[in-house]
Amino acid sequence: MSSTALIHDDEALEPTLQSILDQKTLRWIFVGGKGGVGKTTTSCSLAIQLSKVRKSVLLISTDPAHNLSDAFGQKFGKEARLVDGFTNLSAMEIDPNGSIQDLLASGGEAQDDPLAGLGMGGMMQDLAFSIPGVDEAMSFAEVLKQVKSLSYEVIVFDTAPTGHTLRFLQFPTVLEKALAKLSQLSGQFGPMLNSILGSRGGLPGGQNLDDLMSKMESLRETISEVNTQFKNADMTTFVCVCIAEFLSLYETERMIQELTGYSIDTHAIVVNQLLFPKKDNPCEQCNARRKMQKKYLEQIEELYEDFNVVRMPLLVEEVRGKEKLEKFSEMLVKPYVPPE
């Protein structure tokens, strides 16, 4: 009994993300935390490490601040693009607000819309925007579309600061509800709308209502499939990123509680910006800060004894560009050893 407990303890204490690299069934990896704790650096570094052990990796930023371009020093957009210097690591940045306009526009400007006279275009827009979280949910749909057409083996999400992250994970449910509602409306008013649309020249892009509904139905099926995958610990995990301070620890705890509520697996925490001053270091601020960090680190280890807690040092310069990111990423798999 005691030996089993000891083995479990050893496993729990491995202070690296190696277990994520070893778990070959993983398809979706979310990296999240509050603003300014090094989420993007961590997600880029994790993606770099994954690219060494997986056939193809896609790194997606859903943070409106889009820091991937800054991190790699290369412009990314809403189409997946290979990261310079890699053959199997691609990245893309999604604008949550752009996607729904694209979807509603699909096929022409508002002024060309044959439904504008009926106020139908506006009605569709109002209907769409009245669903909570729908703008970001559409960006999620955009991701799914890309991911389905480009078969990546593993997808890493660099998510927006905490609040948005958890909403992002609810999107499959939000979209499923919205699409179910639209299907119901289409069933009730479809024939009437089709005859009105027919006399007005149809929907933008020459679609009719049935085409639109079947598109939405196939989207709903994809979403429901992904929703199931998100709740499967073999396929999805969430890496929490924080710093050793009260507010960040509080946010992390809140996030872990919510993830557990959504049945989303999380078993790794990356603690960034740690100070390791030498014993005879005369810098009072460094020593005082280290003392505070030590207190919160102990709390993290106590609270999350069954988590892989990775301790990352505060570096003297920014982690930007391929070489620095690669160097930083090594510390995710080989524990950092501070100088004596």
From Swiss-Prot:
Residues bound to Zn(2+): 283, 286
Residue numbers binding ATP: 34-41, 245, 272
GO biological process, one term: response to heat
EC number from the UniProt entry: 3.6.-.-
Keywords: ATP-binding, Cytoplasm, Endoplasmic reticulum, Hydrolase, Metal-binding, Nucleotide-binding, Transport, Zinc
Cellular component terms (Gene Ontology): GET complex
InterPro entries listed in its UniProt record: Anion-transp_ATPase-like_dom (IPR025723), ATPase_ArsA/GET3 (IPR016300), ATPase_ArsA/GET3_euk (IPR027542), P-loop_NTPase (IPR027417)
GO MF: ATP binding; ATP hydrolysis activity; guanyl-nucleotide exchange factor activity; identical protein binding; metal ion binding; protein folding chaperone; unfolded protein binding
Top EC category: hydrolase
CDD domains per the UniProt record, alphabetical: ArsA (cd02035)
Functional description taken from the UniProt entry: ATPase required for the post-translational delivery of tail-anchored (TA) proteins to the endoplasmic reticulum. Recognizes and selectively binds the transmembrane domain of TA proteins in the cytosol. This complex then targets to the endoplasmic reticulum by membrane-bound receptors, where the tail-anchored protein is released for insertion. This process is regulated by ATP binding and hydrolysis. ATP binding drives the homodimer towards the closed dimer state, facilitating recognition of newly synthesized TA membrane proteins. ATP hydrolysis is required for insertion.
Quaternary assembly: Homodimer.
Protein name: ATPase get3
